[in-house]
């Protein structure tokens, strides 16, 4: 078992503005604030999302593209984690539930664009998650 232990850390509140990629926005904040690793939680709305689930048979994600037409994709739950890899790049892993006119869709958030915005919290744990989540 690999175990990461961090202290009670910094909590950063973010407002991801309309038209902005969630992953890029979070990655920029993690890099600029020199964060190490922690949790992501959020709610809000999306204009566009690519949501997938992993197929162990093909070892690929089966992806569904969702786009808001007359409304938004309401983010009822967004949770994940982030960490900085040894090469300095930021790894972000997010799962999401989205309320749509056709029901709720959920899975791995591969891409998401905010509309009108997202309220996101980064809970920095100061963890070296790269040594734990070596598969990423």
Go through each PLM region and give its residues.
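Generic N-terminal amphipathic, Lys/Arg-enriched alpha-helix
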Residues: 1-14
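Structural motif
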Residues: 12-13, 37-41, 73-74, 94-95, ...
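Short, structured patches in soluble enzyme cores that scaffold and shape functional sites
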Residues: 18, 98-100, 122-126
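Short, well-structured hydrophobic secondary-structure segments
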Residues: 21-69
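Glycine-centered structural positions embedded in regular secondary structure
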Residues: 38, 44, 77-81, 106-111
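Short acidic, glycine/serine/threonine-rich loops at helix termini
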Residues: 51-54, 87, 109
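Mid-chain, well-packed structural core segment of small domains
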Residues: 62-106
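Flexible glycine-rich active-site/ligand-binding loops centered on an Asp-His dyad
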Residues: 107-136
């Amino acid at each position: 078992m690999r175990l990461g232990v961090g202290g009670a850390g910094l909590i950063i509140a973010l407002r991801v503005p309309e038209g902005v990629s969630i992953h890029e926005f979070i990655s920029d904040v993690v890099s600029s604030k020199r964060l190490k690793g922690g949790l992501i939680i959020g709610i809000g709305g999306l204009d566009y999302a690519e949501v997938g689930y992993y197929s162990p048979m093909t070892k690929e994600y089966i992806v569904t593209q969702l786009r808001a037409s007359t409304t938004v994709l309401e983010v009822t739950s967004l949770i994940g984690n982030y960490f900085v890899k040894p090469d300095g790049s930021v790894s972000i892993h997010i799962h999401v539930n989205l309320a749509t006119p056709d029901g709720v869709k959920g899975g791995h958030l591969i891409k998401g664009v905010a509309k009108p915005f997202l309220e996101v919290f980064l809970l920095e744990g100061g963890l070296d998650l790269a040594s734990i989540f070596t598969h990423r």
